[in-house]
Every structure is written in C-alpha cells, then in structure tokens.
Amino acid sequence: MTIINYLVTITFFILLGLFYFLLGTALLKDNEKLETTKVVIGFIFHTFLMAIVGIIFQVFKLQWMFYLIFTILWTICCLIYSLFILKTYKVKLFNQGIKDFINKYWFFVILLIIFSVSIFCNAGRMWADNLTDDGYYLVRIANLPYMNNTFSADATTGFKISGINSYTLNTWELEASVYLFISHVLPTVFIRFGMSIFNFFLIICGLHSVIGKINSYYEFDKGVSSFQYYCFIIVPILYAMTILSRSTLGLDLE
C-alpha cells in the first residue's frame, strides 16, 4: 500500500510538471526559450490566479469545495488554451528534438536523486512530524477538504477563529490540499516526499532559467547543455544552510 502511495505521488507530480511545461510553452510561443523558463512561467501563471482566488476564499471564509471546483475548471481552461495555441501557432514542445532535450537536462535527474537521498537520510525526523510548525501545515493540508467550517476554525485544534491573520494571505496549503484530495494518497508521503522534491525541481528550473538569462547578456558559456551543471551550486548551499542553522541557532532545517 505504501509503495502505491509513492507511485501515485510520483506520477501526479510528473504530470503536474508536464502541465506547467505545456502551459508555459503556449504562453511564451517561443521555441528559442529554455524549457526550464517555460516550466517556471507555467507555474507562476497557473498558481497566481489560484493564490488570488484562494485569498478571497480565506478572507470571506467560503467553502473549500467551491475552491476545488474552481481549481479543476481553471486547470482545464489552461489545458485547452495550451493545446489550442500549440496547434494554431504550430509551437513545438521540443524544438531540437527529444535527444537534444535529454542532453540539456539529464543532470537534473542526478540533482533530484541527491535531494531525494537527503530526504530519506533524514527520514527519522521527517516521519516523527518534524517541528511543531511543520506539523501544523501537514494537518491543515490534510484536514481542509473535510472541515465543515473550513476557514472559520483552527485545523489543528478545531477551535473557532475570527478575524484575519497572516495565514489568510498564505494559500500554498489551500492549493496543496486540492492536489492531496485529488491524488488521494497519504498526506505525509505526498507533502514530505512529493512536494519537497517537486519544489526542489522548481528551484533548479528557476536557477537554470536565470543562468540562461545571464548568459544571454554576458555569453560566458556557448553551450546551453552546460547550464545544467551550474545548478549543482544549490546542493552545497542547502547543506551549508543546514550546518549553519545547527551550529548557530540550534535548529534543524530540512
């Protein structure tokens, strides 16, 4: 059963990544743009409206089920738009072919494996609910779809809350609750494993895109396929953050 949860989670996030890539390709309509740039643009475009609508839902304490319906309709609209643009303007997903695509991004797989191994090496704390604050987000994401008074109660205690606080402007748990509800897998696997790796993937996509943009101005490297290797810098940075937090603050950032 646990294996199925992992397989469903992996499949879901692969499809989500492909959706962002498809949407970003349609929005840019430019075959010369880096594929990572297309993923980032697709992610920002899709998530931005969901965040705006999500804030409205949380401020006015609307029912979660209506947000689920909105998310599904918005995603379908983005998908239809993407397919229409790709067909109408004859935009190619892989301008130089799939072989060139693999050559430009194969190192991403290595980076994702390194990050995944790091996660499992920290599995003890990960499955022990980590820090209290992290546990709050887990419980909130898991409980939002099943609460009658979705935004009028504290997801961890069930006590009634009133007014507007900083969490009202934070919609990532709301969006994640929709994805978790659709995938129907264990919250810990989906969030700690799936979302952690997928967010890392988005980070290296953004880093790769920035490197490509800088190179377009300064031309420090002629080969696009070598941009992926510069992304390795994120690995020692993350480890340095962890070591620094342990030695100076006594915290264990994961």
Question: Which residues fall in each region the model found?
Answer:
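Internal/C-terminal transmembrane anchor helices
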Residues: 100-120
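Active-site lumenal/periplasmic loops and adjacent helix-entry segments of GT-C-fold
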Residues: 114-253
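Specific aromatic-rich, kink-prone transmembrane helix
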Residues: 19-24, 142-143, 254
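Membrane-embedded, hydrophobic transmembrane alpha-helices
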Residues: 1-102
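Alpha-helical transmembrane segments of integral membrane proteins
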Residues: 42, 65-72, 105-109, 193, ...
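Low-complexity, intrinsically disordered or weakly predicted helical/coil tracts enriched
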Residues: 13-16, 67-69, 108-115, 146
